[in-house]
Amino acid sequence: MNDHKGLGGLDTEATPGSFGAGEPPRALGQAGLAAENELDAPLASKLMTVNLGPSHPAMHGVTRAVVELDGEMIRSMKLDIGFLHRGFEKSCENVTWTQCFPYTDRLNYVSSIMNNVGFALAVEKLCKLDVPERAKYLRVVTSEIHRICDHLTLVGAMAMELGAMTVFLYAIEARDIIYDRLAELCGARLTSNYGRIGGVARDTPDGWIEKTEKTLDRVKGYVDEIDQLVSRNRIFIDRTRGTGVVPRADAIELGFTGPCLRASGEPYDLRKAAPYLVYDRIDFDIPVGTNGDNFDRFQMRMEEMRQSDRIIRQCFAQMEPGEIAVQDFRYVLPPKPLVYGTIEGLMAHFKIIMEGIQVPAGEAYGYTEAANGELGFYVVSDGGGRPYKLGLRAPGWPMLAALPFMSVGSLLSDLIPTFDSINMIGGEVEQ
């Protein structure tokens, strides 16, 4: 017999007939089975619907995203737009051709001159106008200046919403000094109203080119500083690499253009593929990404700002004195001495102001490589002083429509940099 004693001196050896001796364990009761099954069953989760917008600080405009979440994972997304719809196309059909320019300013208001240029190119095709050389160069210069402004806005906002507030301050400071130069040229910092059918509104003030070159030097310093702060920052890279991925084939299928398409590996740029104005005389490179993710889209903007700097400086070197608008007073207001000194000048001025320019009947499509991609204007004229029909191809809409494709299956925290990287501008998308 085992003499071992348990606690309290009790004999720990089981005797025949005692509990647990010589018999199998008894079956678990219903409560025990339920407890055992709960341990084996997966954790239950409940889907949650979250509204982002329409007045959310990260949405960059009044856009609403209805996101269905499984924990932190996005399971589905629906976009709700139209909060900023102003009837752009119909409004333009009720004013003269020249009066359309302020409406185009309010599409992508961060780079408004590009909108002016695209509309002017479409109307000039119908009128068969050949714009003077200096006007072409001024259009390119101002468009590229506004491209830098647009990209600085994206770079600053995207970095800020990932925690890099310093980058935002640098970007806004750089953009602010560029707006100072635009205000000197156009009279306005944001909505420029600089475009005109047949040319541009005004020539450069004395010393403006030299001041702009010095401004570009300062902006280049800011861009280099931003590059050092975030492009090799481990946190920034981890948050942007591999998120919001759009492969090349899908980007083409979804209708991407501009930096978002090039970030996916497709080297398509209208300034090279279908040159307009004087882009065929300018030497510049087209940056192309490889992964099509948020990091590549960020880097596209960084490099494009440097290329825009190259383009502007080459335009300054090539540009010569000359007219800034065609001297056809059916389309351009005559100079004041002619208006006040001749009956022909007075009549031409009166007809343009009261009736608008008379655009030959027909239809045309004008395009530009805007900051976000291909910006297109389809115009139809019945021979009168107002557009019969105007259609807009907004570059931001295909990217916004693809946001569910880019975000479903990823984390909620990745949605914000993905949204930033497409640079959705509400005025352009919702018109």
From Swiss-Prot:
What species was this sequence derived from?
Anaeromyxobacter sp. (strain Fw109-5)
NCBIfam families linked to this entry? NuoD, PRK06075.1
Single GO MF annotation: NADH:ubiquinone reductase (non-electrogenic) activity
User: Which keywords describe this protein according to UniProt?
Assistant: Cell inner membrane, Cell membrane, Membrane, NAD, Quinone, Translocase, Transport, Ubiquinone
EC assignment: 7.1.1.-
Cross-referenced HAMAP family, in alphabetical order?
Answer: NDH1_NuoD (MF_01358)
Matching entries from Pfam families are given as: Complex1_49kDa (PF00346)
- Give the record's membrane topology: Peripheral membrane protein
Its quaternary structure? NDH-1 is composed of 14 different subunits. Subunits NuoB, C, D, E, F, and G constitute the peripheral sector of the complex.
- Functional summary from the UniProt entry: NDH-1 shuttles electrons from NADH, via FMN and iron-sulfur (Fe-S) centers, to quinones in the respiratory chain. The immediate electron acceptor for the enzyme in this species is believed to be ubiquinone. Couples the redox reaction to proton translocation (for every two electrons transferred, four hydrogen ions are translocated across the cytoplasmic membrane), and thus conserves the redox energy in a proton gradient.
Give the protein name, as stated in the record: NADH-quinone oxidoreductase subunit D 2
List, alphabetically, the PANTHER family matched. Answer: NADH DEHYDROGENASE [UBIQUINONE] IRON-SULFUR PROTEIN 2, MITOCHONDRIAL, NADH-UBIQUINONE OXIDOREDUCTASE 49 KDA SUBUNIT
